[in-house]
């Protein structure tokens, strides 16, 4: 480090570690077809003030370490002058609000997107009686119900973040849908966030298949 270079306000070693963790998991999700056309964004808590997050507009199946950047919890770039996802505030609001949350994943699978369109009018998808509800932290039985919120899509992330915050004031949840867009899911770490994401995907698939079999909603 020369005399004109300010020290980084976060651990470069920790960022290196998280970049590789994110890239490995994101690549698997990309290969599953959940991140088409450079869509989706992913992050991991770096420390008490920063998160590592994917740079905007990058092919998620071909990420390299330079495609992971650092933002503070106001969503501002730290260290390198890169552009984070437009939806960065939807990640950082969770880290700011819940110190225990360590990872946020946002994907655009066909199932997630179709479900978000079908249930946009009601604003919620009710999942009930499924054994896989036990995949969500805090659930110990299939004899329970979970309501997955569906928010209207908007390009104003301040508005959407405020709507999410207002709902979090009333209920606990591990994810939500955005109409015509995709799914946000999170957890205490990457493993838990992946478990929640995959459980949502499976359960939404089941609900859509039931709709086809019943012929009505």
From Swiss-Prot:
Q: Which family does it belong to?
A: Belongs to the aldolase class II family. MtnB subfamily.
- Read off the SUPFAM superfamilies from this record: AraD/HMP-PK domain-like
Which organism does this record belong to? Answer: Xanthomonas axonopodis pv. citri (strain 306)
Record's keyword terms, sorted: Amino-acid biosynthesis, Lyase, Metal-binding, Methionine biosynthesis, Zinc
Give the gene symbol.
mtnB
What's one Pfam family the UniProt record gives for this protein? Aldolase_II
The protein's name in its UniProt record: Methylthioribulose-1-phosphate dehydratase
CC per GO annotation: cytoplasm
Q: Which cofactor does it need?
A: Zn(2+)
Cite the Gene3D superfamilies for this sequence: Class II aldolase/adducin N-terminal domain (3.40.225.10)
Q: Which pathway does it operate in? A: Amino-acid biosynthesis; L-methionine biosynthesis via salvage pathway; L-methionine from S-methyl-5-thio-alpha-D-ribose 1-phosphate: step 2/6
Q: Where is the signal peptide?
A: none
């Amino acid at each position: 480090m020369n005399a004109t270079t300010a020290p980084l306000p976060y651990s470069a070693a920790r960022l290196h570690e998280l970049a590789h963790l994110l890239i490995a998991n994101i690549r698997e999700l990309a290969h599953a077809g959940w991140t088409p056309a450079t869509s989706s964004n992913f992050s991991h808590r770096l420390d008490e003030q920063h998160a590592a997050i994917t740079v905007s507009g990058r092919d998620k199946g071909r990420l390299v370490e330079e495609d992971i950047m650092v933002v503070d919890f106001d969503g501002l770039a730290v260290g390198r002058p890169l552009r984070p996802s437009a939806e960065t505030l939807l990640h950082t609001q969770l880290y700011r609000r819940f110190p225990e949350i360590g990872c946020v994943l946002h994907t655009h699978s066909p199932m997630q997107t179709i479900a978000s369109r079908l249930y946009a009018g009601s604003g919620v998808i009710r999942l009930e009686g499924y054994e896989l509800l036990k995949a969500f932290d805090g659930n110990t039985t299939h004899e329970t119900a979970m309501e997955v919120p569906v928010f209207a899509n908007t390009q104003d992330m301040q508005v959407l973040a405020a709507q999410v915050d207002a709902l979090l004031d009333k209920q606990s949840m591990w994810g939500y849908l955005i109409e015509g867009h995709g799914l946000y899911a999170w957890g205490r770490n990457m493993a838990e966030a992946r478990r929640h994401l995959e459980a949502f995907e499976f359960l939404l698939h089941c609900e859509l298949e039931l709709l086809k079999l019943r012929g009505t909603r």
